[in-house]
Amino acid sequence: MTTPAPTFDNNAFTMLAALLEQWGLSSLSSDVQDMLTAGDSADIVPIKLRQTEAYKTRFAGNAQRIKNGLPALSEAEYLSTEASLRTVVRQYVGAGTYDTQDNLQKWISSDVSPQELNDRMGIYQDNWDLQPQSVKDAWASHGLTPRDALRAAMDPNVTETQLKRQAAQYSVGGAAVKAFGDDRALNADRAMDLADQGVTKDQAEKGYRDIAGRYEYEGFLARSAGMDLTLAEQEDAALLGDQRAENQRKKVINTDNARFQENYLGTQQSLSQSAAGKY
């Protein structure tokens, strides 16, 4: 007895072709056609499709999730997460450079949610992207470019804690550049130290404005008195509330006041004596 040839299910093919289009795997349509022609049911075909290299490449993030001890996402979850991640990236840096399939797979495999990526990109925008060009140029000359910062924001291996620490360092250093108009007060290690001690962006901007406004004058007073008043001491006083550093400032100012009083009174006394001698 001859076995009847399997009949081709057009309805199943239409449904599966639509599924492939959703997955971005329309190139597998001929494979689906062959499977249905061979007698595979519409329930079996998706299982076989998941074994193809094209499918594994398209949903490569899932294989890495499993290696990382994370559960695989369903195709619908994967595609939804992918679309949301792509939207976040384009919102901040546009399309074409960073919304690549490799980056999307990297974030999905590392379980970076769209909200987490949005938070990280917000940190980048607030602390790097919106800085004036003078700050970007100054930091670039010290080895940190905006592109480096953007890559750190997008790198799931850089923890959010590390990213915030770098952002705080950048903001503190940026405040120094804006206040002085150049990078004379920019020191990467010092900026990180101040950030680690809790100096915020707003505090740094106010503190460095105060320092820049008096730096040359108080430095001149210190040199005239044969004393030291370093930038670090000015920073300690203005940004950290260090009493020892503030006392050093006051000592410089008070020494100058005493010298002024001495010179002024000496001059007045000399003038008085000269005037008395005329009579």
What residues fall within each predicted segment?
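General marker for long, soluble alpha-helical cores
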Residues: 2-279
